[in-house]
From Swiss-Prot:
Compartments (UniProt record): Cytoplasm
PROSITE patterns tied to this protein: PEPCK_ATP
Organism: Histophilus somni (strain 2336) (Haemophilus somnus)
InterPro entries, A to Z: PEP_carboxykinase_ATP, PEP_carboxykinase_C, PEP_carboxykinase_N, PEPCK_ATP_CS
Protein name: Phosphoenolpyruvate carboxykinase (ATP)
Length: 538
């Protein structure tokens, strides 16, 4: 048993006093009872669905709130963090100590005198580099979410648990003084790296806790020479490891959940001297338009102990996965063992030999697959391109390009080139090959079928792409296969999907100019300038 007096004292050191009761690392059974209790109202209330999973709503925040993210500026962080600037805007906005103390006071006051859920867990499967994380919340389903998403400690590990980082979730409290403090709004997601504390106020979105700790791993690990990656990963029966980078909605979770391969994890990984390891103990899958036919493994994972967010639940308790009226970003979190085919007992494997960059190109320009040179690998990793099409966010009706460094700029705490350097070094050491895979659209106006994309991934993983005859795509100078087993050959060169190739040419020139403009921010040093040649020619 954990010594609860010790936990109470540690909370007191943070400023949380007069705790009525601590519910420490409750079982799933207890969490189910707690989050579906009669009398719960508003966003605290969980609804049991016919699958057995509980569904909750997160209110107006159905995604992260990057405009409300801050990091305390101090001696430790001033020269290490990739701070936002007018020249290159990002989400790492500096916060002074005075404002931090004020926000910390708001959250600790909110959590004081309450019955609290305290979850002690790990972020990172390797004992040497993992963060021991303590999450403190007054909301049962938030405790359920982090129990799903972080690595659950053994009883023995709990005995000697000493938190490196504490997440204090005060979703019920907002900041009345935000204007005077020069902040974006009354909501806040703030980090003090020196203190080892994350504060959340005003937003109920569960992903703030998950991605908050990812941002912290992205701070600590690359400084130790360990690659820290926004990617999914799996391993074949011969021990061959593949990693899949990509922004939200490009197919990381879907494509890495493969019946022929064991899943290491679906979103956050490190790569050290021993190989690739998961940061998490669960998966956080998008559920919009989910079906048993298209994604059987994820569909089956939605059962008791899974937690659905912002889905539409019908009168009879069934879920309408096609209904995006609350948000397109409907989600489910579940413990990783809800997927049958996973690496056990620890989510880690050897060095990666295949590195796949997923992009969903709504312009219809990029090929469904191309093999990258080492220079192109760095270029496309730093570019982190994808594009949204109508309907993914309010008010967007045409292709909108997103360039997100390292396929995860929102979570980078250090400068993007630091992640690129560490990744390319790891790839060099393991002899890994890199590929750019477009899961988006082509000249037909339709999205490339998941069947063709899976065929492409199979060809990469089984090595058959290596023996394919290759052609070259102009403007982008990308190497593209002329034929692959199980893939419609008519789609491999995107120009062939247009009735008139001049249409492709015009779109390609437009997209190339956007790549070039985006990359200007990296051309401030010799190394960045040297990579320009690896990109498209506008």
């Amino acid at each position: 048993m954990t010594d609860l007096n010790k936990v109470i004292n540690e909370l007191g050191e943070l400023g949380i006093y007069d705790v009525k009761e601590i519910v420490h690392n409750p079982s799933y059974e207890q969490l189910f009872e707690e989050e579906t209790k009669p009398g719960l109202a508003g966003f605290e209330k969980g609804v049991v669905t016919t699958s057995g999973a509980v569904a909750v709503d997160t209110g107006i925040f159905t995604g992260r709130s990057p405009k409300d993210k801050y990091i305390v500026l101090d001696e430790k962080t001033k020269n290490t963090v990739w701070w936002t600037s007018d020249a290159a805007k990002n989400d790492n906005k500096p916060m002074n100590q005075e404002t931090w103390q004020s926000l910390k006071g708001l959250v600790t006051k909110q959590l004081s005198g309450k019955r609290l859920f305290v979850i002690d867990a790990f972020c990172g499967a390797n004992p040497d580099t993992r963060l021991a994380v303590r999450i403190v919340t007054e909301v049962a389903w938030q405790a359920h979410f982090v129990k799903n998403m972080f690595i659950r400690p053994s009883d023995e590990e709990l005995q000697n648990f000493k938190p490196d980082f504490t997440v204090m979730n005060g979703s019920k409290v907002t900041n009345p003084n935000w204007k005077e403090q020069g902040l974006n709004s009354e909501n806040f997601v703030a980090f003090n790296i020196t203190e080892g504390v994350q504060l959340i106020g005003g937003t109920w979105y569960g992903g703030e806790m998950k991605k908050g700790m990812f941002s912290m791993m992205n701070y600590f690990l690359p400084l130790k020479g360990i690659a820290s990656m926004h990617c999914s990963a799996n391993v074949g029966k011969d021990g061959d490891v593949a990693i899949f980078f990509g922004l939200s909605g490009t197919g990381k979770t879907t494509l890495s959940t493969d019946p022929k391969r064991q899943l290491i994890g679906d979103d956050e990984h490190g790569w050290d001297d021993d190989g690739v390891f998961n940061y998490e103990g669960g998966c956080y899958a998008k559920t919009i338009k989910l079906s048993a036919e298209s994604e059987p493994d994820i569909y089956r994972a939605i059962r008791r102990d899974a937690l659905l967010e912002n889905v539409v639940v019908r009168e009879d308790g069934s879920v309408d996965f096609d209904d995006g009226s609350k948000t397109e970003n409907t989600r489910v979190s579940y413990p990783i063992y809800h997927i049958d085919n996973i690496v056990k007992p620890v989510s880690k494997a050897g060095h990666a030999t295949k590195v796949i960059f997923l992009t969903a190109d709504a312009f219809g320009v990029l090929p469904p697959v191309s093999k990258l040179t080492p220079e192109q690998t760095k270029y496309y990793f730093l570019s982190g391109f994808t594009a949204k099409l109508a309907g993914t966010e309010r008010g967007i009706t045409e292709p909108t390009p997103t360039f997100s460094a390292c396929f995860g700029a929102a979570f980078l705490s250090l400068h993007p080139t630091q992640y690129a350097e560490v990744l390319v070094k790891r790839m060099k050491d393991s002899g890994a090959e890199a590929y750019l895979v477009n899961t988006g659209w082509n000249g037909t106006g339709k999205r490339i079928s998941i069947k063709d994309t899976r065929g492409i991934i199979d060809a990469i993983l089984d090595g058959s792409i290596e023996s394919a005859e290759m052609g070259s795509l102009p403007i982008f100078d990308l190497a593209i296969p002329k034929a692959l087993p199980g893939v419609d050959p008519a789609i491999l060169d995107p120009r062939d999907t247009y009735a008139d190739k001049a249409q492709w040419q015009a779109k390609a020139e437009d997209l190339a100019s956007r790549f070039v403009k985006n990359f200007e921010k990296y051309a401030t040093n010799e190394e960045g300038k040297a990579l320009i040649a690896a990109g498209p020619k506008a």
